[in-house]
Amino acid sequence: MAKRYLLDFEKPLVELEKQIEQIKELARDSEVDVSQQLLQLETLATRRREEIFKSLTPAQKIQVARHPQRPSTLDFVQMFCDDWIELHGDRNGGDDMALIGGIGSINNRPVLMLGHQKGRDTKENVVRNFGMAKPGGYRKALRLMQHADRFSLPILTFIDTPGAYAGLTAEEQGQGEAIARNLREMFGLTVPIVATVIGEGGSGGALGIGVADRLLMFEHSVYTVASPEACASILWRDAAKAPEAASALKITGKDLLKLGIIDEVLPEPSGGNNWAPLDAGNTLKEAIEKHLDTLLQMTKDELIEERYKKFRVLGKFIEANNIEEIYSEIPPQSE
């Protein structure tokens, strides 16, 4: 079993984990019955882990969402897909490995599944570009979604990206146009679309496959217009203020559900999805099946109309009767 990667705020668990491993080694190397001690330590570790994860700040949730052992798109595909055939290429000479897709079936129901894919180590992350898709990735995604629309396949998307790749080559190849085209075309698809934020949901990179009839989020996932680090650098010119930015951006599932941005927050196992990936997979599978059962009862016209309405009402603003009222709400700037 791979060694668990503990985050900074999980450090109180380090000593307990060491003791648990020592007892397990003792049990393997001798005939001493240590089951009672092992049970006590594991129970204590579980209780402390639950206490820690019940009070996570938005900045800490970002760390969980970025955890290197968090289940990825391909992990979930393998967990609950009866069969899976990956489809490649954007039909324009590229095959972006940061955004993958293919046809599979869930309980004998054929679906198109696509999502961002990060790597587990440095070598794989270089191949996957750390989950940051280039224009070709979004064009591949659109090709696959149009294929699904043609053959009446429900679309499942899995969002896990810090953002679309912002390098010079991506701009030269039309990153903005590729994402904008996806947004426009997804509003016109006549099949159900269920999107899930399984890790990071960053900026336009997430939106490029995020126009959906139902948008779900795991409990410790994040969905944001910009990374807190970028936001802090822009607003305060200090990336160290990222924790404050994370709180102000309202990036957690609880906040976004209250704002009407997402439709459901999926609970995670104690310690996050990386501690019990199979439990996370079962939770996601049940949620997807529930929403698909509802959406498949709707006509094509109803799907398009409801999807349009869902996004049309997003966003809020405050009206003031006069300009003085607006300025009175702005704190004075120090010299």
Curated annotation (Swiss-Prot):
UniProt xrefs under InterPro entries: Acetyl_CoA_COase_a_su, ClpP/crotonase-like_dom_sf, COA_CT_C
Pfam families reported for this sequence: ACCA (PF03255)
Gene3D superfamilies from the UniProt entry: 2-enoyl-CoA Hydratase, Chain A, domain 1
EC number: 2.1.3.15
Reaction catalysis annotation: N(6)-carboxybiotinyl-L-lysyl-[protein] + acetyl-CoA = N(6)-biotinyl-L-lysyl-[protein] + malonyl-CoA
Any one of the GO CC terms: acetyl-CoA carboxylase complex
Residues making up the signal peptide according to the UniProt record: none
MF GO annotations: acetyl-CoA carboxylase activity; ATP binding; carboxyl- or carbamoyltransferase activity
Keywords associated with the record: ATP-binding, Cytoplasm, Fatty acid biosynthesis, Fatty acid metabolism, Lipid biosynthesis, Lipid metabolism, Nucleotide-binding, Transferase
Pathway: Lipid metabolism; malonyl-CoA biosynthesis; malonyl-CoA from acetyl-CoA: step 1/1
PROSITE patterns: COA_CT_CTER (PS50989)
Subunit record text: Acetyl-CoA carboxylase is a heterohexamer composed of biotin carboxyl carrier protein (AccB), biotin carboxylase (AccC) and two subunits each of ACCase subunit alpha (AccA) and ACCase subunit beta (AccD).
Family: Belongs to the AccA family.
Protein name: Acetyl-coenzyme A carboxylase carboxyl transferase subunit alpha
Species this chain originates from: Prochlorococcus marinus (strain MIT 9312)
Name of the coding gene: accA
